[in-house]
Regions:
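Midchain, well-structured core segments that form catalytic/ion-binding scaffolds
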Residues: 1-27, 45
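Short, contiguous acidic/charged loop-to-helix segments that flank catalytic cores in large enzymes
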Residues: 15, 46-51, 114
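Generic non-transmembrane alpha-helical segments
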Residues: 24, 28-36, 59-67, 85, ...
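Short, low-order "capping/linker" segments at domain edges
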Residues: 49-67, 93
């Protein structure tokens, strides 16, 4: 929130489900704000989503579960990833937020990011097998 030319300005960034679109959301916001405010400079990007039952997603999650012995299921997240820059891609990899880290270890994607060696080697195995399986799929 900031002031511009004597007016309060608020920027907004929101994520919305695949069952709607940016124009519909903008119309609903305009209808809700009434008088004394306006919605301007609306930009929108189509939500990025790939169904969990596609062969590629199944190959990735099946590989993860077979290697780890887990029973994980695919999930979506609200933030954007590098995957949205490709027509048919997802971010994929193990996420172990519950593991103890070395004293110097930082959080995932943060300064001094750390993970136990056995989990890094397990991740390499998952990636190799998943890539070999993905190579067999006719996209």
């Amino acid at each position: 929130i900031f002031m511009r030319e004597g007016r309060i300005v608020q920027t907004m960034d929101s994520r919305y489900p695949t069952c709607t679109d940016g124009d519909t959301i903008a119309k609903q916001i305009r209808a809700a704000i009434g008088t004394g405010a306006e919605l301007t400079d609306v930009g929108s990007a189509k939500p990025f989503y790939i169904e969990a039952d596609t062969p590629a997603i199944k190959a990735c999650i099946d590989t993860y579960n077979e290697v780890t012995g887990d029973h994980a299921t695919p999930f979506t997240m609200g933030g954007g990833t590098y995957a949205r820059h490709f027509p048919y891609a997802v971010s994929f990899g193990p996420e172990h937020v519950d593991l103890p880290l070395p004293e110097f270890g930082g959080p995932m994607h943060g300064a001094n990011e750390a993970a136990p060696i056995d989990k890094l080697l397990e991740a390499v195995k998952i990636y190799i097998i998943a890539l070999l399986r993905l190579e067999e799929i006719d996209f």
